[in-house]
Amino acid sequence: MDIRLKLILAAVILFMVGLPVSGILRGTKPPPPDPDLAKIAEPLQNPQARSSSDSPQQITKEEMVFIPPGEFIQGTKQGGFNERPERIVNLKGYWISRYEVTNHHYLDFVEQTGHRKPGPPSRYAKRLAQLRSPNQPVAYVSWHDADAYCRWKGMRLPTEAEWEKAMRGIDGRLWPWGNSPRIFKANLGGSEDGYEATAPVGSFPLDRSPFGVYDGFGNMMEWVENWYEEQAVNLNESREANSADRGGYKTLRGAGYTSYGIDLRITARSFMVPDFRDETIGFRCATSKLDKNPNDSLL
């Protein structure tokens, strides 16, 4: 190849390589931002989720559901070692939150008490944008945060047995809707259910227990009051009985929006140290005070 041809070829290569560089140097207008980044848990088309036409400005009111006294089936024969055995448990009547505690209501608590704001370490702050709309369940709260909120409301966290009865009913079903593990009935792992992250509370009509309590199976795992007891048969519903010297872990119930697995059931149990905070963990409150309707004092 002669010198002249080489020079022409080199000039063509430099011209082609220089196009994108010159665009940057001249301040070429960048492409429009991905609209998905501006959306916060916007639902996809899914018949199991509520219509996206619901006003995002309408705040979901805190509401308590009364769970009547009596027996229910706790545990299961089909589950893991910490879910067995299946047994009959008798509870007194109590009230429990219909929905997981939302960002709106938790931030009211923060503003009025000066309590720590919910949120991840700064390196994960970008992720928080998907979790912060008013009607989404509050995330990044420790057991201590959840306990403080419920006490501020004049309530407490539910016990394991109270949580399970409220989410399951009394007939031993394995999911809030029955005994069929069908997909898209709750906000679990993946976006096929209609949400990339958490959904506004109560978005899945089928993730509703026989008592009318929402999101027990999906959306967020939830702190309960008990210290974790590996052998479920040894659970003592006297809330003072399970102490930190029995392992130092608090119990988590339910599944979350990142949970996968065909073996997920409403009876599943997990645990974590009480000062742990994560985007998959939230909570709800309960009370055994039966002298008045707690809904009368909720905003």
Name these PLM-found stretches.
Residues I67, I73, Q78, P121-S270, ...:
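Functional-site microenvironments in short loops/helix caps that host divalent-cation chemistry
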Residues E62, E86, L91, S133, ...:
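Short coil/loop residues immediately preceding or within conserved phosphate-binding loops
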Residues D2-V12, M16-K39, A49, P137, ...:
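Disulfide-stabilized, aromatic/cysteine-rich ligand-recognition loop
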Residues V65, I88, L174, E222, ...:
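Residues embedded in well-ordered beta-strands
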Residues Q57-P121, V141-H144, G218:
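A short glycine-rich, aromatic-capped structural motif
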Residues S52-D54, F81-E86, R269-P274:
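Short, P/G- and charge-enriched loop/turn segments at secondary-structure junctions
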Residues W95-S97, V224, R284-A286:
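Residues within well-ordered beta-strands of beta-sheet-rich folds
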Residues D36-K61:
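N-terminal low-complexity, Pro/Thr/Ser-rich intrinsically disordered segments
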